[in-house]
Amino acid sequence: MTKRTFGGTSRKRKRVSGFRVRMRSHTGRRVIRTRRKRGRSRLAA
């Protein structure tokens, strides 16, 4: 039996891949645009 290695930290996750971080850069905005187009219910972490 293998142990779960992903702990998950809310603050770190938001700082790396949150909505405001995505909107800062051109490529980040492209990510949001693509996810909107695909109809994702959650655009960012």
Curated annotation (Swiss-Prot):
Residues 10-45 have a biased composition (Basic residues). It comes from the Bacteria. InterPro entries: Ribosomal_bL34, Ribosomal_bL34_CS. It holds the Pfam family Ribosomal_L34. Residues 1-45 are annotated as: Disordered. One of its GO terms (cellular component) is ribonucleoprotein complex. NCBIfam families: rpmH_bact. This is Large ribosomal subunit protein bL34.
